[in-house]
Amino acid sequence: MPRDLTHVIFAEDIRKNLSAEAQRDTGENTAAFHMGAIAHDAFLYGSQPKLATKLHGGLGDDTRAVMIEMMDDVRAEKDPEKQAMKKSFVYGFMSHAAVDTTFHPFVYSVSGSQVPENNPDQKHVDLAKTRHRYIETWLDVHFLREKGLSLDTFKPFKQVANDKRTNAVVPSFFCENYEKAYGIDQDLTPVFKNSMKIQLFIGRVTQNQPLGKALRALDNALDGRLGLAVSGFYQADRAMPPVLKDFESYKHPVTGRNVVQSLRGLTRDAVALGTVYIAAAEKYIKDGVTKAFLKAVPNCNLDTGVENTKLADIKLATPADVEKLKGEKIKAFMRKGFKAFPCGARNADPARRKQADNAPEFPLIPFKRTGFPYAPPPTGLRRVQPACERAGYRPCPRFSAKRPAFRHLCARAVSE
């Protein structure tokens, strides 16, 4: 799985390439479309995660079986409103398959296999899962930034969680056809609903920046023992690791061959493949010709990207160092000047505060002995204290008796 936000972003990009009818159906049933885009992964968060592994073909199952059952259900549906809703879910489901098939070989080439038999012990399994979460969370951050979206404002899953019309029809539609496709004698609808609730809840929690920073600090203090918990948190204040952004090729984790491909190329290919998949689904719903659909949508394992393989076949990956996947903090304040404002402006009336906000900017001068960024006052000694208070990091150097470096700085300001 690339994570949920990546799947929704790609679903929207793929939507632009669809037929007018498909665009209308998905536009009128956005909640169903987005639910379909993340449905493959929902079971991973619940009590039966192997149901998700099965959907991805990880156990050797045909990844198209559920698709065909759902499309036959859509063909038999007589209610136009429900049919459009179900079609939208299927189209989102197809987009997920296309994105996973395209991106997962690269993801696993960096994260390594999570299957116990491919690892010497549980510690290595957990490391692979940690790397996997880091990679997919970074992909979310990358595509959000590329689209100019923010975690604070981009909330596609509110509608998924709150749309009563969709939740009354789609979960049972999906689960009943899942049961038919794989011959499961169990009502999976409550399992799916509970799993998706957890999925959406974790998605919200991992967007909490203060909590993420606190956990990262604790993880560093504990030598990485919180890796699994920390790796899923979004890092809005950090830059995406070069190993995930600037690559030009990667070693396929199953075949071992060198795949010449970049992040931009993977993005382009995922959108193109999703367009083909949904066009094939739309055609099948209209004419019911199975052979044409199976030719357009091969039985690719969604983890390996290779036909007729299992998750355990990932044996040739070259995992990256976890430390290289954490990203470096963006030191934006070192590239921008501070705004100087009068002493006490933080507690002043609105007029003075506005005046302070409109004050001119001054460049930062890192002080050699302390490395502390200091904005020199525009005039003599009287502006030293306000400028220091304005910086907000340490007390004014004039009153830092135990800081000779700052006393020296103060003296220099006096002489100037």
Q: Where are the language model's segments positioned?
A:
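Short, intrinsically disordered C-terminal tails of secreted or membrane-associated proteins
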Residues: 411-415
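Aromatic (phenylalanine/tyrosine) cluster motif
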Residues: 362, 367, 372-374, 393, ...
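Cationic, low-complexity basic patches in intrinsically disordered or flexible, solvent-exposed regions
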Residues: 355, 369, 386, 390, ...
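N-terminal leader/auxiliary helical segments
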Residues: 1-92, 97-367
